[in-house]
């Protein structure tokens, strides 16, 4: 029975809430107690642990965990040798990559990366930043920031390398981006030994499929409608679905039921066009998972 348990590292902190919601949509209910770092998962084959995303790659590589979710940025920062099971395109506030940027005060004379020669740089991403600057032939003093990195310039640092999703915090602190050095998304990772275990590999692949299906569903909705026979061709020309629309003839042979999966953002502009084309009886519904 011991070999039938997958040790999973879940990110604590900024990614935690989004990750737990994603797992729920994928079909896993995870209960987290405020006093415990061991969440209860309604799958006896998964044993979870909450850890800082920065730590997950190290513990996965060493085999203390079979697998885990972390940012691509922390995989590079820790310089670990792990296997990527899946890319999961989500962050704290949305479903797009986050960026690590070099930023300086708005009135700083620093305009380009080359101007950082000999300067002080504060960041949480020390290892990757040093390697990045070295690749550019730039020598600078890079030191670890324990948080509130945006307030360090100009007195405690000449520049910072910081994580941004919307850029709002940088603007609020009157900082100007001079370079993006890394784009990062969440990754589901494992180690070589766990990947060699056929049961664990299949279990991880199944989890990855469900998580990716839940993510894909975030951007899509289902749409049902009734279409008269003489309007069917016109309506179908307007629809862009994941695959071909599902078409069923109704009891009244002059009418059809049409069902499609489409991008949610397209619904508001598409519905009036579909109605004008002759469709009626629209029903829009949310999706939990879309698995191609």
Curated annotation (Swiss-Prot):
Subcellular location(s) of the protein: Cytoplasm
Molecular function terms, GO-annotated: ATP binding; ATP phosphoribosyltransferase activity; magnesium ion binding
CDD domains assigned to the protein according to its UniProt record, in alphabetical order: PBP2_HisGL3 (cd13593)
Reactions mediated catalytically: 1-(5-phospho-beta-D-ribosyl)-ATP + diphosphate = 5-phospho-alpha-D-ribose 1-diphosphate + ATP
GO biological process terms held by the UniProt record: L-histidine biosynthetic process
Cofactor(s) in the UniProt record: Mg(2+)
Matches recorded under InterPro entries: ATP-PRT_HisG_long, ATP_PRibTrfase_cat, ATP_PRibTrfase_HisG, HisG_C, N-reg_PII-like_a/b, N-reg_PII/ATP_PRibTrfase_C
Protein name: ATP phosphoribosyltransferase
Organism of derivation: Thermodesulfovibrio yellowstonii (strain ATCC 51303 / DSM 11347 / YP87)
